[in-house]
């Protein structure tokens, strides 16, 4: 990215910050609590960026002084070595700050702070694909535990030999979507299934969709568009299983989206969960349609969330997980144990770099 473009954006941010400072000092603003809170929040959001930019300017001045010292220290080996070391340290800090400032200039995604509905569907591979879907579910549950997130299954279709034909997990916590959005797509596994007697390696797939939770204000649903029915559902056990219809089957007629929810103990709770899933699915559908109208280059980026894209292969024989978007390998056991931080960080970095290039191109 052109440094002059970055500097112009940072100078504009500083001007905005200074204007906010003046507004906050205005007595008429102090008398309006709502406006005061809005301006104070915006000031707090911009302050780290402004402080980093001021530090970068200070580093530039210190770098020039160190260069001058280096010129003047010719013939004095000890002083020259000190000047070289200082230049190295200053250059390293400048590089880190430059990168941080570039990323900070990217438009924020308002969905990043949201919790998610994570849907896993068994794909090609029959029973083995269902088992693989179960393995992926455990991987995400372990990662969520590491992050301190809450995980609740809200809809599940279990397979006869284990695993799931389909599973939807509600994962709630801070900035869940910002991390898990990179998991959307086709996950392929290459391994010898437990049901394979000849020891042959099979290839199976499961599809992951990551949908930010949608508030009722985000998605308007006309009750006339819903077809809701109930069914008997397994649950707490005993006579309740056979006599009480707690499962909810919800159909959104305009889109054909169907949600079957059985995990809660009451029909009312299952209906609420089904509506949560439907809102998330409708919001995801709107976003997919909007993305389809964008350029092919934009849709191909790391964080596109295209559920038909093969994003990763898990090779048991070689103990290797390959992320095809990054062209990088990661230890299989580490990934399956839910230690996804390195992988997610690499995806985030690649996504940010691509967006920076797009931002610079759009401004040129």
From Swiss-Prot:
InterPro entries: PCRF, Pep_chain_release_fac_I, Pep_chain_release_fac_I_sf, Prokaryotic/Mito_RF, RF-1. The modification N5-methylglutamine is found at residue 239. PROSITE patterns: RF_PROK_I. Keywords: Cytoplasm, Methylation, Protein biosynthesis. GO terms for molecular function: translation release factor activity, codon specific. Residues 306-326 have a biased composition (Basic and acidic residues). GO terms for cellular component: cytoplasm. Residues 292-326 are annotated as: Disordered. Methylated by PrmC. Methylation increases the termination efficiency of RF1. It is found in: Cytoplasm. The keyword Mitochondrion does not apply. PANTHER family: LD18447P, PEPTIDE CHAIN RELEASE FACTOR APG3, CHLOROPLASTIC. Peptide chain release factor 1 directs the termination of translation in response to the peptide chain termination codons UAG and UAA. Belongs to the prokaryotic/mitochondrial release factor family. NCBIfam families: prfA (TIGR00019), PRK00591.1 (NF001859). This is Peptide chain release factor 1. The lineage of its organism: Bacteria, Bacillati, Cyanobacteriota, Cyanophyceae, Synechococcales.
């Amino acid at each position: 990215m052109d440094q002059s473009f970055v500097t112009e954006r940072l100078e504009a941010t500083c001007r905005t910050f200074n204007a906010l400072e003046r507004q906050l000092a205005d007595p008429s603003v102090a008398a309006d609590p709502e406006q005061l809170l809005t301006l104070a929040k915006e000031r707090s959001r911009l302050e780290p960026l402004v402080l980093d930019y001021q530090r970068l300017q200070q580093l530039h001045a210190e770098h020039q002084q160190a260069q001058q010292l280096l010129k003047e220290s010719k013939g004095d080996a000890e002083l020259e070595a000190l000047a070289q070391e200082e230049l190295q340290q200053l250059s390293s800090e400048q590089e880190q700050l430059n990168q941080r400032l570039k990323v900070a200039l990217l438009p924020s995604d308002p969905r990043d702070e949201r919790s998610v509905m994570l849907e896993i569907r068994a794909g090609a591979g029959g029973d083995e694909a269902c088992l693989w879907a179960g393995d992926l579910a455990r991987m995400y549950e372990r990662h969520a535990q590491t992050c301190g997130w809450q995980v609740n299954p809200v809809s599940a279709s279990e397979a006869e030999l284990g695993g799931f034909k389909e599973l939807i997990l509600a994962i709630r916590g801070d900035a869940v979507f910002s991390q898990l959005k990179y998991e959307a797509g086709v996950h392929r596994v290459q391994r010898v299934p437990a049901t394979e007697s000849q020891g042959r390696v099979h290839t199976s797939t499961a599809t992951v969709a990551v949908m930010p939770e949608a508030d009722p204000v985000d998605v308007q649903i006309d009750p006339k568009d819903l077809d809701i029915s109930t069914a008997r559902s397994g649950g707490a056990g005993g006579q309740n299983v056979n006599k009480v219809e707690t499962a909810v089957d919800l159909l959104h007629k305009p889109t054909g989206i169907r949600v079957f929810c059985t995990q809660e103990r009451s029909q009312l709770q299952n209906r609420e969960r089904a509506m949560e899933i439907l809102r998330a699915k409708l919001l995801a559908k709107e976003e997919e349609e909007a993305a389809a109208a964008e350029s092919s280059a934009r849709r191909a980026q790391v964080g596109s969330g295209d559920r038909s894209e093969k994003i990763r292969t898990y090779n048991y024989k070689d103990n290797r997980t390959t992320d095809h978007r990054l062209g990088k390998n990661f230890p299989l056991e580490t990934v399956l144990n839910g230690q996804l931080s390195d992988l997610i960080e690499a995806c985030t970095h690649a996504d940010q770099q691509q967006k920076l290039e797009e931002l610079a191109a759009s401004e040129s």
